[in-house]
Every structure is written in C-alpha cells, then in structure tokens.
Amino acid sequence: DDYPYTSEGVYIYYSGGTVDVATGDEVRVRGTVSEYNGLTEINASQVLVCDSGKTVTPTAVTLPVDSLTAFEAYEGMLVTFPQELIISEYFNFDQFGEIVLTSERHMTPTAVYEPGSTEYQAAALAYQLDKITLDDGRSASNPDPALHPNGAVFNMDNLFRGGDKLANVTGVIDYSFNLYRIQPTEGADYISANPRPAEPEEVGGTLKVVSMNTLNYFTTLDDGVNDICGPDQLQECRGADTLEEFNRQHAKLVAAIVEMDP
C-alpha cells in the first residue's frame, strides 16, 4: 500500500507440504493472518505460483532508527543496508549464528556513566536504536559448519573480529525471540577493520596475566533424564546435553588453552 508505517511484505507459513517456488515467483496465497510470537504471518491453506522471473528491489534501511519499533514497518521485506556496519557483538554466534551489527562502536554504558544516571539511560537507548541482529538463515542450534557473514564457511582462514565491518548487508527482516533480525539472502562484503595484534605492547614488566572463560563447562550432562545435581541434589545439571557435545567442548577448550602458550 506504500504507506510508510506498514510493511510491504509478509511471511507465509504453510504446513500443507512442499511448494515448488523460487526467488522471483509471483504467488497467490489463501489463508488467515495471524501473529506468531510477534511476527505477522499468513497461515496459508493454499499457495499457487502464478508467474516467475519477477525482480524485487531491496528497500534501503540505515542505522540508527528513530524508534524501537521502527523495523516493524519492514517486517517480511527484502532490505539492504547501504552503510558500513560494525560487528559489535557475537556472543550467540557459535550457538545460533547471530551477530549484532551497529553503525558505530558502543561502550557498555556502565563503563562510562553512573548506573541509573540520565547519561547511562541515554547511552543504553542509543545502543538499542543502533543495532540489528544478523542471523544465518538457519534455525539449528550449534550449527556445523558455522557461516561467516560473507556467506562462506567460518574457519581459521575466514575469520572475523569485533570491530570489523560489513557492507551491503541484504536480507529479509524477521522478528523472533524478541529481536528484529536480518535473515540474509546473500553474503555481505566483509572488511577487516580491527586486526588482532601479534603481541601486546611492551610495558617493561616481567609478569604475564592469562585467563580463559570456559563458559558452561561442567562434567555433568544436562540430558533431561539424569540431570539432578547440586549439594542437595535439588537442581538441574548444567553443561552439555550429550557426551558427544561435552567431548567437542572439551577438545575446543584444551586446544585454545594450549594455543595461548602462557
């Protein structure tokens, strides 16, 4: 409808089997409009392909946005970010393939301002308005292989670091798990902007300080069956879900510690 506050796209949920569709197809959909965990979708009873070979021009979107609900107007649409975006967070990259992108680097508000202060609140809001989550287009947990945001496999020859940049990020705006996110339709242009130092600057000292965050490394298994732990045996166990997952975690941690060579 070309109204700026409503989306020109919508997600289609179809449980009636597979439909032979491709990018550029024109389809006719019959179904019921619904909200699924905050995502507007059509629960389709029928999907028919009417034509093919159509082109869709992605809508340009930039960060920061004006409001926390600004991406609602692009939900289900193919969009592109013409600006360079910074890789600001990747805590969920290994488990869910998620990377948080911003237009500039943001300090943790409490590292700069007094908690609860006006300045703190302004900085926290500025970050929320300046971020979008880049997903990997998959729903798997602990995906193997992981995908680099450039679309290729993530490995030791194709890495990224916080502070590196992406250009021409293009995909469909999605909403799930309380986040607006981009489901990419193509790899972004990767720019190495924050290379890892070969070694720390010389400070004249003789001591080395090393650390390793092992995250949820427990020898107990959270397998949903025998996962009763704690001093009083009243808590669920923490750690990997299976022995195979634990062995994978163990091997990765040992290799990382050895590579540090403290």
Predicted regions and their residues:
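Extended non-catalytic accessory segments flanking core domains
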Residues: D1-E236, E245-V258
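Proline-aspartate-enriched helix->loop->beta-strand connector
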Residues: D261-P262
